[in-house]
């Protein structure tokens, strides 16, 4: 009985061709068969074309984005302007609402009964800024003279009184000098010294 072969189209892979997928022991495709399929479907596969061909999400270099240049859109600004309305209540009611909001915020974080004292304590501890100065040119504060420092107390007997002092104190001082050292003009020690100098000159 004659055997007829199946006609093969031009360009179709045959069994002897290396590009025909080969099945493994269980009939699954092996890595070699997958490579053959890619080589058949993508001409030039395995010759460096897969490096240049990238099918996926395009990435760009990450750069620091400055938020200072981001501005609020005109639509958002217009919406805020349209939504805001001036208060319609009187001054007394507005003050009460503000005071109630402060008490409520204090009760949300602390259980002490006096919110005002707590707030004043925080202001003193945290050194809250004082009231701003009135507008206008800054005034220089006047300089105030300080009183002179008192003289240091002297212990009696530290030094002899000045012999040439005038007045009653000078007289007393001179008398004291005469009593101690033999007169205001000089004592016996001074006379001996003068005699020794005169003898040396002659």
UniProtKB/Swiss-Prot annotation:
Organism this protein belongs to: Torque teno virus 1 (isolate TA278)
Any Pfam family hit: TT_ORF2-like
Listed name of the protein: Uncharacterized ORF2 protein
Region (Disordered): 1-21, 149-202
InterPro entries for the chain: Hepatitis_TTV_Orf2a, HEV_TT_vir_Orf2/Gyrovir_Vp2_N
Source lineage: Viruses, Viruses incertae sedis, Anelloviridae, Alphatorquevirus, Alphatorquevirus homin1
């Amino acid at each position: 009985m004659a055997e007829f072969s199946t006609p093969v189209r031009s360009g179709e892979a045959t069994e002897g061709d290396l590009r025909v997928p080969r099945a493994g022991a269980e009939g699954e495709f092996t890595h070699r068969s997958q490579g053959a399929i890619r080589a058949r479907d993508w001409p030039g596969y395995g010759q460096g074309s897969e490096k240049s061909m990238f099918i996926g999400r395009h990435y760009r270099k990450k750069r620091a984005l400055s938020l200072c240049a981001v501005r609020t859109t005109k639509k958002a600004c217009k919406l805020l302007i349209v939504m805001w309305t001036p208060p319609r209540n009187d001054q007394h009611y507005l003050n009460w609402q503000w005071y109630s909001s402060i008490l409520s915020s204090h009760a949300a974080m602390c259980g002490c009964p006096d919110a005002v004292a707590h707030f004043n304590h925080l202001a003193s501890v945290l050194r809250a800024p004082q009231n701003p100065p009135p507008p206008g040119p800054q005034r220089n504060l006047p300089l105030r003279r300080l009183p002179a420092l008192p003289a240091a107390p002297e212990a009696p007997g530290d030094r002899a009184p000045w012999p040439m002092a005038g007045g009653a104190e000078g007289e007393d001082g001179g008398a004291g000098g005469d009593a101690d050292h033999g007169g205001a003009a000089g004592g016996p020690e001074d006379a001996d010294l003068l005699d020794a100098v005169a003898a040396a000159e002659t």
